[in-house]
Amino acid sequence: MTGNEFRFFLSCDISVPVTFRVERLEGNLPLPNPKSPDLETNAPTENRTKELFVECALYIDGAPFGLPTRTRLESSGPSYCWNELITLTTKYRDLTAQSQLTFTVWDLSHGEGLIGGATILLFNNKKQLKTGKQKLRLWAGKEADGTFPTSTPGKVPRHERGELERLEKLVNKYERGQIQRVDWLDRLTFKTMERIKERESLKNGSSHLYLVVDFCSFEHRVVFQESGANFLFPSPIASTNDIVVVWDPEVGKINPSEHKQLKLARSLTRGVIDRDLKPSSNERKSIQRILKYPPTRTLSGDERQLLWKFRFSLMSEKRALTKFLRCVEWSDVQEAKQALELMGKWEMIDVCDALELLSPVFESEEVRAYAVSVLERADDEELQCYLLQLVQALRFERSDKSRLSHFLVQRALRNIELASFLRWYVAVELYDPAYAKRFYCTYEILEENMMKIAAGVNGEEDGFKQWQSLVRQTELTAQLCSITREVRNVRGNTQKKIEKLRQLLSGLLSELTYFDEPIRSPLAPGVLIAGIVPSESSIFKSALHPLRLSFRTANGGTCKIIFKKGDDLRQDQLVVQMVSLMDRLLKLENLDLHLTPYKVLATGQDEGMLEFIPSRSLAQILSENRSIISYLQKFHPDDHGPFGITATCLETFIKSCAGYSVITYILGIGDRHLDNLLLRNDGGLFHVDFGFILGRDPKPFPPPMKLCKEMVEAMGGAESQYYTRFKSYCCEAYNILRKSSNLILNLFYLMAGSNIPDIASDPEKGILKLQEKFRLDLDDEASIHFFQDLINESVSALFPQMVETIHRWAQYWR
């Protein structure tokens, strides 16, 4: 089962009796009332042994259902421990959503004295059956009330819940096997929990009694559903105007005739297999329509049958392989065997389709191994474009030492840049407890194999030195984290923090200004960095105080890097990777839109590096120069050029605006404002800070794309020829990227198991939103009209201009 699946049982399908265990009573019993008539005639209180029992009853919709059940008498207290299994005559399938159990504790030591009672609903507010240990607070002197709503709820009020309740929930998960067992750590944890429990008891006093009950657990969650609830349909022959609801017990079940026909049609042992069978004209149209489906679409039964029927004639169509493999019944041994034989003879698929075969949909090891064999044809540059997703695909493998893991390591050993990125991508995933063991296995294999590399005849370093250079990257990031913490602790404005940074680099941490040996830059492993230049390093004016560090390189140059601590850069890393990939796809079609795919690398869950690109935000530019054109005139003046700037500069601005308008629309980039739109001196515009993607946006009523009026004015206004050229570039880029929609969708699908916030929250919904942006239902001409309407809608949006003003006010006070 993958991490994205939620498997469950329906309560209406469970035909076993309701079972639970009454465990113990916690807390101190109240002292008897001295004025009680029982105490006046009986022995003194201190000599009387209390004899307690618990009476349990089931109430359905506020009415008693069945007879009450009692536990045995227990007198060996405190604490009173029954640990008795109670089985009711009622079955889980008979329960309603408002079913509840009542528990009343009685004392027989003097008559039939009432200690207290409590009630608990069997289903929570998500309609899931409660399982595991439940701690019920008893209402002293009250018999449990089974009416709905009850007057004796056993649930502790939210404002009174302490740390102990959170721990008890974790213990329930631990006992259900949802938390990994680590013996030595578990022993320490339970000892600490006992101390917390004692502390909570002392803090709360002994004013409350609690009854601990252990509910039955199942392999999967149990979700409430009434018997036949989904199979009620209005009668088509109702003789009155009222809607008559009848239950058809066969609705929703497999039709035996259709199932038999399907088995016969696909049987490999009956009849003659016609390998030369060709589809008719209509069938060919249907097949072509199916082959155009995006990888996210599920095939219907008829579509699967159609592809299976003409599987032999489709072997020369490479696009058909992934669709064919989706229609295979892998549980049928003979069918799976023939599918694998055909796969080996099929026309070799493209790398894009191989990525689809590594998705969680395909579990067959042979299919996944075939996908890896296709990837082996890709060169290092192309492989690096998909490396982030290929590392995530390790989650879907059936073993830690898979063919994919071996392939990634072998390619990394041939290219130090691939090795550096692979090491970082794997290292970041070690924070995921569910897959830490798998990623650590790949990390170890990479380390062991790299250590075995001998020094090259042309002066190449041996494997040990190469690995040590990569390890020193981690040591560097650890020191940068320490610097960030020191700087944040400085009180005062940004200038004081900058002074502290330079003071640290020149004093305590002066070893960072000149490294003993050059280190490969984590962002660009081909570049060797030799130390930090304190005088050229600074801090950004931001809540997290990112460091802007200037590194001297081994060849005498410099490179600037931004280091951020306290921000998860994995989402930014993914978006910038997509920008880089789309830039590559556009250039393959001879369309260079002057994009700026700067480098981003997450080095941990809340830290990472970004390449610094000399630029200024549009907010700064407009504040100081009033317009974008006035700013560009300072760097590229031309009295004879359009608007007083060179034609090359204006063309760069128009193209980059078009490129990012299309990309931010497709990826659903949110939270766009003038502070995260940057402009280079050559006129190239680019976006930064991708905290919201796939349609999420903290601002109300966001436009489809970020295209502010100042950008349109820089092109001469909505009626100018340059604005028309901008729209033309947008439409051309949109249609080019639509052709590669399957590649982009496959890459996002492989990220479905990652911990990237906007994907992890709902992977299926996010990928469907991405698919929707491509408008695959339109042809190229219709998509041009669609995108032009989209541009017009974005330019005329008023609300974002109001939000921009509010954002500027917020920045002023920061």
Curated annotation (Swiss-Prot):
GO terms for biological process: autophagosome assembly; endocytosis; pexophagy; phosphatidylinositol-3-phosphate biosynthetic process; phosphatidylinositol-mediated signaling. Its EC number is 2.7.1.137. One of its GO terms (cellular component) is phosphatidylinositol 3-kinase complex, class III, type II. Residues 668-676 are annotated as: Catalytic loop. Residues 687-708 are annotated as: Activation loop. It comes from Glycine max. Residues 539-545 are annotated as: G-loop. The lineage of its organism: Eukaryota, Viridiplantae, Streptophyta, Embryophyta, Tracheophyta. This is Phosphatidylinositol 3-kinase, root isoform.
